[in-house]
Amino acid sequence: MNFTGKNVVITGATRGIGFAIAEAFVQAGANVAICGTNEAAVNEAVEKLSAAGTKVIGRKINVAAAQDCENFIADTVKELGSVDVLVNNAGITKDNLTVRMTEDEWDAVINVNLKGTFLMSKAALKVMFKKRSGNIVNISSVVGEMGNAGQANYVASKAGIIGMTKTFAKEFGSRNVRVNAVAPGFVRTAMTDSLPEEVKAKALETVPLKRFAETQDIAKAVMFLASEDASYITGHVLAVNGGLYI
């Protein structure tokens, strides 16, 4: 896919899925703006991504803070020229059984995952509406569709993202802004690599394809939804879960 000249904003892009998405876009010719909560990690990611030869900027922000989101989008427009694609990837977990989960654990996850998606979208939409063109891809999760014990806060946030995606698609279609979501299943990361073999084997028993997704699998799904190949797709939740939930 060719994204030459396109400007893409990706939240939570210093590592894991977010970094893989950013890497895929720069390799496809896009200019990229990334953000994270650790300034050193943001700077390191910017340096790595810049090797592809496109423009890359990075900022340390809190996606749950409206002014941070507004400033980040303003900086992106100033330095890159516009915003064509927004990928809402930033997310955290604070797992606990419901009866033990604190309000702080609940609020922290909802604020970053759900409120952050809302605030960043709202900031980017001002740019997209003005040019009557844009594309938003939200990262949800398979657990937002099927639930998961010990993750009431995370599941609620990811289910909320699915509902928000469908609502956004209905609201913004007349402005030529498409909104879709990707719902990953188990994804291979440094964290999953460190799990005991018996734990990984038990997890894979539930996956018909018998492997974890690679971060690049998620990146490819995001790029498809952001591309012209998906120009008549909006309000869709693309499952990338190896058949874990059908």
Question: Where on the chain are the PLM-derived regions?
Answer:
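Conserved glycine-rich cofactor-binding loop
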Residues: 7, 14-16, 38
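The beta1-alpha1 cofactor-binding region of Rossmann-like NAD(H)/NADP(H)-dependent oxidoreductases
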Residues: 39, 60-72, 103, 216-217
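C-terminal helical subdomain
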Residues: 181, 204-229, 233, 240-242
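Residue(s) in the substrate-gating loop at a strand-loop-helix junction
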Residues: 141
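Substrate-binding pocket helix/loop in short-chain dehydrogenase/reductase
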Residues: 97-98, 102-110, 192, 203
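Alpha-helical segment proximal to the catalytic Tyr-Lys
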Residues: 126, 170-174, 231
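Active-site helix of classical SDR
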Residues: 121, 157, 165
